[in-house]
């Protein structure tokens, strides 16, 4: 059976279904930042002490994390550039989220999982993301997330961003936006919607 990890951001649970994730979100949302693993993993192939075997990741998406601690507009510009130069020409519709903090998350989903040998999954995702970062000049594409690839944790949509400085909720929620909204709206409008939506 497959499971997804839950974190705050430290990994504290293995969720076998949406209901288990929702229980964690109900417990921690508004108190801690809520994260889930990008990929699901096979619980029949755990490592020693029940640790996750990241080589069992089911590769059904490619995940992008755009971050800039000083200017989130740079992230928006990178996301727009990638949509215009990569997604639109290939007729790809990504899922895009304003994280509520200083960046965006994007997923490009596959029609079916990519079947790669277990020992090359991490390297394949990492090298592909590095290639895209260079080719499309994605300066805000997070190198730490690229290097972690299959073991990355992503902010859970519809959860409140908690300030790392104050430990308090900011009133800004991780919110999904359409490609059209991302291409047309300014950063202030996007943040305003991320506050209103929830």
Model-predicted regions and their roles:
Residues 120-164:
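Aromatic- and Lys/Arg-enriched surface recognition patch
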Residues 71-74, 114-118:
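A generic structural signal for short coil/turn motifs at secondary-structure boundaries
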Residues 61-64, 87, 91-117, 153-159:
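Histidine-centered divalent-metal-coordination microenvironment in nucleic-acid enzymes
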Residues 1-61, 66-79, 148-153, 157-196:
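DNA replication initiation on ssDNA origins
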Residues 118-119, 168:
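Short, charged, solvent-exposed linker or helix-capping segments at domain edges/interfaces
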Residues 74-92, 120-137:
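Long, well-ordered alpha-helical scaffolding segments within enzyme catalytic domains
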Residues 47-54, 83-84, 90-99, 141-145:
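Catalytic micro-motifs at enzyme active sites that drive phosphoryl/nucleotidyl and oxygen chemistry
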């Amino acid at each position: 059976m497959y499971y997804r990890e839950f974190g705050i951001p430290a990994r504290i649970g293995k969720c076998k279904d949406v209901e288990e994730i929702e229980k964690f979100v109900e417990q921690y949302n508004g108190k801690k930042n809520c994260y889930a693993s990008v990929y699901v993993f096979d619980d029949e192939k755990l490592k020693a002490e029940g640790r996750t075997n990241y080589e069992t990741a089911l590769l059904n998406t490619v995940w992008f994390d755009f971050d800039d601690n000083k200017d989130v507009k740079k992230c928006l510009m990178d996301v727009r550039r990638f949509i215009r130069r990569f997604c639109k020409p290939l007729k790809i519709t990504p899922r895009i989220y304003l994280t509520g903090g200083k960046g965006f998350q994007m997923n490009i989903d596959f029609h079916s999982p990519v079947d790669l040998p277990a020992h090359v999954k991490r390297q394949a995702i990492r090298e592909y993301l590095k290639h895209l970062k260079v080719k499309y000049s994605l300066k805000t594409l997070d190198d730490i997330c690229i290097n972690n690839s299959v073991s990355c944790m992503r902010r859970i949509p519809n959860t409140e961003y908690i300030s790392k400085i104050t430990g308090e909720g900011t009133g800004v929620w991780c919110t999904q936006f359409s490609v059209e909204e991302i291409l047309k709206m300014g950063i202030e409008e996007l943040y305003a919607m991320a506050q209103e939506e929830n």
